[in-house]
A protein has these predicted regions:
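Juxtamembrane helix-loop-helix connectors linking adjacent transmembrane helices
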Residues: 2, 13-48, 56-138
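Loop-to-transmembrane boundary segments
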Residues: 1-9
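Transmembrane helix-loop-helix hairpins at the membrane interface
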Residues: 89-217
Length: 217
């Protein structure tokens, strides 16, 4: 059912949110203010955190402590913090040439790639330092809680990562989804080696660094 989100991508030949008319309609307003960005962050966390807790049985079969333990949402150690920082930086360095390679293969095959300018315009309202922090926290914590915290312990590495990838089908073409899938595999492997907190840290730092690099360019 998750892959139903890919139906518009298949029908249109490109990610729905990158279609020119939709993209222009979404970018008619001024850049988001700090207050608006913080409100978006609060809204996202206000539903994802309770949803994750409910999904693992809180408060019916687990108390808060055991629910957080089931989600592997714990306070990371200093070593884990250092590991998270190192992995996030490594992913930023490695994913750039990998994304380029995927684009070259897609172009060679004659398949549509995710246009970089359109993707940048999609996130234009939040392309500032505060927006980078908000996107990092929102995506990092929300997506990792649901995919690596709730689903992976029950369903293993692959199925939750397919769900994670499908969540991005409205904003990327299939070349971008392959990149997301590879990133998700990295987060999933990290979850087996550490915990969801470290996954959220790495995911959030990765998104933050990518946005900041885009701003500086």
């Amino acid at each position: 059912l998750t892959w139903l989100s890919c139906v518009p991508l298949l029908a249109l030949g490109q990610a729905p949110l990158l279609v020119s008319g939709i993209l222009e309609a979404m970018n008619t307003g001024a850049p988001a203010t700090t207050r608006e960005q913080l409100s978006e962050l609060a809204t996202a966390l206000a539903w994802t955190i309770p949803t994750a807790l409910l999904a693992v049985g809180y408060p019916l079969v687990r108390n808060l402590g055991t629910a957080l333990a089931r989600l592997a949402l714990v306070v990371p150690t200093r070593r884990q913090l250092a590991l998270g920082l190192a992995v996030a930086v490594a992913l930023v360095v490695l994913m750039d040439p990998l994304t380029l390679l995927i684009s070259l293969v897609w172009n060679w095959l004659g398949w549509p790639v995710s246009p970089a300018e359109s993707v940048e315009r999609l996130f234009a309202r939040n392309l500032n330092p505060v927006g980078a922090v908000v996107m990092g926290i929102t995506a990092g914590l929300s997506e990792e809680l649901l995919c690596r915290g709730v689903l992976q312990p029950r369903l293993g590495l692959l199925l939750p990562n397919l769900f994670f990838t499908a969540l991005h089908a409205y904003q990327y073409n299939f070349d971008g989804l392959l990149t997301v899938f590879i990133l998700g595999l990295a987060f999933g492997v990290l979850r087996t080696r550490a915990n969801t907190s470290v996954c959220a840290l790495v995911h959030g730092l990765y998104d933050f660094l990518v946005v900041m690099i885009t701003i500086l360019e």
